[in-house]
């Protein structure tokens, strides 16, 4: 969908015409940033204001599958202002429940949480706080507790560290290969996402 009009306007049309995949509860958006020293994906950057633990688990698994299609091995961190149970925040409890659900549905997925953003990207810090963490190395799929935190984190990283080089957003949960561009999309990103849609369409044939 084009870079004119709002994201949710396009999403409404997609929902009416294409709909969600069988069994999918919700849509979500994943953006990938090509930073100097790492490639990082963030979800959800555009859709869910206050997702449930079940919805977060669903689109975490979907985002990991999308990364594998791009030949990226997902290493997932569930983010919160709570750090492995150190805080009493609602987002921390929600992300801990999401972790349980993801481990039930995709036991092969390398994932841990809930954790601060610095712990997700700094293994030494993470292991100092939780030596038994099941996540090794740097996380490359950052799952945020709501769309506000996801969108803010994405735009800050894109501008300050990513040189405005980004891929996405990838729409997760739709019953066809379809993506929604944002008003800040460059020509390069439009071409990239058109190519991604073709790759996704070929994959489901």
Predicted region positions:
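Anion-binding alpha/beta catalytic cores of soluble intermediary-metabolism enzymes, centered on
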Residues: 1-136, 140-205
């Amino acid at each position: 969908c084009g870079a004119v009009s709002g994201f949710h306007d396009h999403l409404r049309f997609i929902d009416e015409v294409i709909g969600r995949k069988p069994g999918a509860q919700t849509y979500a958006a994943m953006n990938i940033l090509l930073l100097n020293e790492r490639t990082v994906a963030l979800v959800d950057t555009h859709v869910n204001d206050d997702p449930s633990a079940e919805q977060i688990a669903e689109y975490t698994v979907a985002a990991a599958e999308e990364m594998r299609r791009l030949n990226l091995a997902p290493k997932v961190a569930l983010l919160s202002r709570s750090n492995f149970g150190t805080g009493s925040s609602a987002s921390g409890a929600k992300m801990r429940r999401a972790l349980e659900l993801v481990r039930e549905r995709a036991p092969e997925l390398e994932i841990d949480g809930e954790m601060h953003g610095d712990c997700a990207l700094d293994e030494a810090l993470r292991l100092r706080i939780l030596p038994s963490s099941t996540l090794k190395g740097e996380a490359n799929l950052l799952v945020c507790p709501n769309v506000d935190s996801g969108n803010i984190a994405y735009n800050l990283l894109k501008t300050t560290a990513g040189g405005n080089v980004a891929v996405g957003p990838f729409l997760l949960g739709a019953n066809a290969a379809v993506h929604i561009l944002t008003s800040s999309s460059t020509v390069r990103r439009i071409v990239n996402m058109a190519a991604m849609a073709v790759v996704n369409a070929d994959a489901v044939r």
